[in-house]
Curated annotation (Swiss-Prot):
Compartments reported by the entry: Cytoplasm
Keyword Transferase included in the entry's annotation: yes
Active site (catalytic residues): 45 (proton acceptor), 72 (proton acceptor), 193 (proton donor)
Gene assigned in the entry: pdxJ
Domain of life: Bacteria
Annotated function: Catalyzes the complicated ring closure reaction between the two acyclic compounds 1-deoxy-D-xylulose-5-phosphate (DXP) and 3-amino-2-oxopropyl phosphate (1-amino-acetone-3-phosphate or AAP) to form pyridoxine 5'-phosphate (PNP) and inorganic phosphate.
Designated name of the protein: Pyridoxine 5'-phosphate synthase
GO molecular function, one term: pyridoxine 5'-phosphate synthase activity
Organism of origin: Colwellia psychrerythraea (strain 34H / ATCC BAA-681)
EC main group: transferase
Length: 246
């Protein structure tokens, strides 16, 4: 059985903090709890508008994490400079629109290949492993290879949004084909967006996936059950998906 890693996104702890402009709840403390419960890494998205995660969070997490930071960022000069200063283990390049509630789709690597290749080169030179958040589209996957990014994160949001089981199965097959295609080209494949306790197992069973990044569902469950239990429950579902599909 291949190991499947869990990256816990703590952005929504910061969202709750920013709603009142207080210094609590602290995403840094939440990251520590998540690590204790079995998280293999912590994901944070420093958005240009600073709507949740703040610069301070990134710097303190860098000093305190026992696992590794996955720093989600737009492809801008400001974010590249911050990443090169902080030097997280991973940077995931994502599309970003100020008016969106959350990331709405994958990065258009095909249409921005030169820009993304340059950013990848800069981040790689700083010792950071680069991932591109993309849809399971062959053209985008081919462009990711051309950019020299070693990792991709496949966008699972459309799969997660579908309510029909039949439609979900069709989308799951599309994702699986794309993930296997990327893996065969030598890319290391992660996945995430919209995954929760009810839809994670079919994705977790795809053996080419190295890591799932999950945030909103875990933080929402934590509001009821507590963060430690929420992380442990998600890890158990992922383990079951791999155990029963070997």
């Amino acid at each position: 059985m291949s190991e499947l890693l869990l990256g816990v996104n703590v952005d929504h702890i910061a969202t709750l903090r920013q709603a009142r402009g207080t210094n609590y709840p602290d995403p840094v403390y939440a990251a520590s709890v998540a690590e204790h419960a079995g998280a293999d890494g912590i994901t944070v998205h420093l958005r240009e508008d600073r709507r949740h995660i703040q610069d301070r969070d990134i710097h303190v997490l860098k000093q305190t994490l026992h696992t590794r930071m996955n720093f989600e960022m737009a492809v801008t000069d400001e974010m590249i400079a911050i990443a090169c200063d902080v030097k997280p283990v991973f940077c995931c390049l994502v599309p970003e629109k100020r008016e969106e509630l959350t990331t709405e789709g994958g990065l258009d690597v095909v249409g921005q290949l030169d820009k993304i290749t340059k950013a990848t080169e800069q981040l790689t030179a700083a010792g950071i492993a680069v991932s591109l958040f993309i849809d399971a589209d062959k053209a985008q996957i081919d462009a990711a290879v051309a950019s020299k990014a070693p990792y991709i994160e496949i966008h699972t949001g459309h799969y997660a949004d579908l309510s029909s089981e039949e439609e979900q199965l069709i989308e799951l097959e599309r994702l699986t084909v794309g993930i296997k295609y990327a893996h065969n080209l030598g890319l290391k494949v992660n996945a995430g967006h919209g995954l929760n306790y009810f839809n994670v197992k079919p994705i977790a069973a795809i053996k080419e996936i190295i890591e799932l990044n999950i945030g909103h569902a875990i933080i929402a469950r934590a509001a009821i059950d507590g963060l430690d239990k929420a992380v442990r429950d998600m890890k158990q579902l992922m383990l079951e998906a791999r155990t029963y599909n070997t």
